Amino acid sequence: MLILTRRVGETLMIGDEVTVTVLGVKGNQVRIGVNAPKEVSVHREEIYQRIQAEKSQQSSY
């Protein structure tokens, strides 16, 4: 795992088309903004896991 340190307003690049920007830090929460092409799905981990579980349930019918 690559670990990076960024300050508010700083951005990191993932490939050529995805940017992740630190928007703010309040206590133990970090607000980030993600810019990605429409064909790239961006989800919080818990949402992604729920989507995968739903897909798995649908394929088992």
Curated annotation (Swiss-Prot):
Keyword Signal: no
GO terms under biological process: mRNA catabolic process; mRNA stabilization; negative regulation of translation; negative regulation of translational initiation; positive regulation of translational initiation; regulation of carbohydrate metabolic process
Consequence of gene disruption: Essential, it cannot be deleted when cells grow on LB but cells will grow with pyruvate as the sole carbon source; if glycogen synthesis is impaired then cells become viable. Most deletion experiments use an allele which has a kanamycin-resistance cassette inserted after amino acid 50, which retains about 10% residual activity. Increased levels of glgC transcripts during both exponential and stationary phases. Decreased levels of enzymes involved in glycolysis. Increased biofilm formation. Decreased expression of it antagonistic small RNAs CsrB and CsrC.
Key words, A-Z: Activator, Cytoplasm, Repressor, RNA-binding, Translation regulation
Binding partners and assembly: Homodimer; the beta-strands of each monomer intercalate to form a hydrophobic core while the alpha-helices form wings that extend away from the core.
Domain notes: Two regions important for regulation and RNA-binding are found in the N-terminus (residues 2-7) and middle (residues 40-47). Both are part of the intercalated beta-strands that form the hydrophobic core of the protein; region 1 from one monomer contacts region 2 of the other. The homodimer has 2 distinct RNA-binding regions on opposite, solvent-exposed surface of the protein.
Family affiliation: Belongs to the CsrA/RsmA family.
Protein name in the entry: Carbon storage regulator
Taxonomic lineage: Bacteria, Pseudomonadati, Pseudomonadota, Gammaproteobacteria, Enterobacterales
